[in-house]
Amino acid sequence: MSESSTDEKEGWQEAPEQPEPPRVRGDSPRKTVLPADADLGKLVHDSSPEILTAVAADARLTEDLALALLNHQDLPREALEALSKNGQLARLRKVRMAIAVHPRTPRHVSVPTIRHLYTFDLMQVALLPSVPPDVKRAAEEVLISKLASISSGERVTLARRSSGRVAGALLLDKEERIMQAALANPQMTEVSIVKALKAGHGTELLAPAVARHQKWSYRNDVKAALLGNKDTPSDRLIHLAAELPINLIKDVLRSGRLTTQAKNSLLAVLEKRGVKA
């Protein structure tokens, strides 16, 4: 070897290696483990997906820091999943709610989380415009399944303020004040009322109320459903029948779900109009 090359070798020094962040043994290299002295208060605002996921999984994370982390609208799905598995922290009410409604929470995380929410948290999930439709529907289904076990006062509040689908289920409540509150719900729909009237049971309070309702009793599909309901007051049958178009009267007659009195009322209307049944 030449003297010059030996001098070059002796004069050359290798740059010190930069230490890599600690990793989880035997797992994906992207799953960073935070050092013991990590400042979680700063790291929750980091832009690195790997750091945010590591923060979400850290056992030292507090409720306030978890909520700050969940304020990231672009929080990685991996971070949301890690947070949902973070022990007691993931069971806290506010954290659960924030995980359930976060736009990037995977469905296999959000739907099971929803099942553990409180009644009025479920109501909020179903009402928030930012929540995906399938997540809203899951919240509504859980809420409807709980109706039989929650208090009368809670059902009144739900009847007044919940989504149209939940209010629709409360149309068949055994308490008149709850049924009336559901009927007046701003999100109540004609479809929900017709569905409730066709339930076949539990309409003893609903049918008379709808038959005299200033808004809903004038809808043709509602009138048709009332004519097919055994609980519709007899003094309203002829008026409802008289207001229906001929084609709808014939459809109702063909349905075969009429009481004798309702059928006779419809036939009388057709006869008066000179139309054969």
Spans of model-derived segments:
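Alpha-helical scaffold segments
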Residues: 2-277
